[in-house]
Amino acid sequence: MGEGGLDFKFLPAGGQFHLRGSDEALTAYGGLVAWDHFLERCGVFAQLAGDYPLPRTSPNATPVIDILKAFSLNCLVGGTRFAHCRRLQDDTAVAKITGLHKARLCGEDAFRRLCGSLDAAQVEAWFAPAEQMIHHAMPPNAVADWDSTVVVRYGKQEDAAIGYNPQKPGRPSHHPLACVIGGTRLCLHMEWRKSNTVSASGWIEAMEKVWRSPLAQHRIRLNRGDIGFGQEPIMAWHEQGKGKRPSYLFKLKLTANVKKAIAAVPWDDWQGKSNEGLVQWVELKLKLHGWSSERRVIVERTLKPLNPSPQGSFWKQCEEDFSAYVTDLTTEEADAFQVVQLYRQRADAENVFAELKNQWGFAGFCSQKAAGSGSSARMLLLVYHLWSLFVRVLKNQGSHTEAIKSRDELWFIPAKLVLSDRRKIIKLAVGGKLASFLEEAYQRLEEWLSRTSPQLSLSMDKRPPWLLFAPTQATQASVTSPTLRLLSSLQLRILG
């Protein structure tokens, strides 16, 4: 906006100020320079654009990579709708930094049109190589946490169906299923499903897709899930592998037969003190109706006050709170108490969906066509992964930093683009502690990129030559890349 188009006077506490527009290349997203440099060296978007399954014959068509970049930028600035990309379209600095061919971000319909002609199989095959990249972030002896969520839809969208929806009963929704690597906040696989399904619907097919990866077969040691996954077909899938498939740990629904078995347990068999507020547990061998074999079941019991009020209860009675878990882990691998503790660690997996829906717009991007909604969900998940890995490199920390904080630290930085001779200079409006923090972060990024191959192959049969988290215990075939060995320290910090 030119100076003549905006001219106001305001009188804040600091005195009178003149507010005027400027034609200079100013942006609120100074962190974009380091981010786009990271993407260019990784080559993920370039490979994804090259693998687009349909031919594009129009000479005026926006390049696929520009469309992918525009969608990713919309996600990073907090957009939750396709239309929210408009806030970036007039930012000339963003267009110049990202090298867009038309010197301007594409419109809100570009991504929908790009994916609208695809079917579900093409969408999944298109994003599958990028998903394989996350397989290399798995630590040894990884735990795969399976969970699902409800994405409410408004209006009419393909594949949106009426099903389980506790927030908006009777309203159509989608019901995606995800596999999260325990302790990493990274999603190994996602199935985009209708809502007229349960948590376990299509689990075996999804697990088979994950299990086709040699890395998954080598590193996943346990599948973990809540009540919805403790079903005979899923447990039988693990047991049919004859020791070559991962173990399982699922929460068991307290059916009438399970309650009957718990009621038959003698009081003396419960381990632990029977004081109010303390946990007791017992181990059972059960073969419930529909089960093909007898299985190990651990029952947890907590004595809770019936009337937990400040005045106390009149009769001093307690009620019993039960939870049951079914697993094929042996007593040598984990005792009853350790099984319960191991299950409780899966709570962090639910934070992935919470962050995606509340901070990344996972529940917002939708299209009338199913391919548009599914593609936006997969693309958003890819951006989430890349940003998480980017933040880990810059901050050099073990714990995950959610987007609501990391964007303020590394993305929303006021900046000015200056063209000096043949050089393009970005001046960041930072000082003090923030300047020192960014200097250290960018030095770590430069050091990491200097040791990393600039190419990234995402084909199904080839490993990417760069890895953020190298396994400390891997097969000989998985350590052929030189960068896979030199980054082992980052792999250790991912579990912090």
Where are these regions (language model features)?
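An anionic, glycine-rich sequence signature occurring as long contiguous blocks
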Residues: G2-A13, F17, P246-N358, Q443-G496
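Acidic/histidine-rich, metal-coordinating catalytic segments
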Residues: I220-G230
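Basic, amphipathic alpha-helical segments enriched in Lys/Arg and hydrophobic/aromatic residues
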Residues: A363-K427
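Short, surface-exposed basic-aromatic patches at helix termini and helix-loop junctions that form
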Residues: L215, M235-P246
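Structural motif
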Residues: L26, T57-D66, W315-K316, S367-A377
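Dynamic "connector" segments at or just before major functional cores
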Residues: M1-R171, P176-T197, S201-A216, A415-G496
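Short amphipathic alpha-helical "interface-anchor" segments enriched in bulky aromatics
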Residues: F38, C85, E333-M379, V383-F390
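A short acidic (Asp/Glu
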Residues: G155, Q231-W237, K259-A263
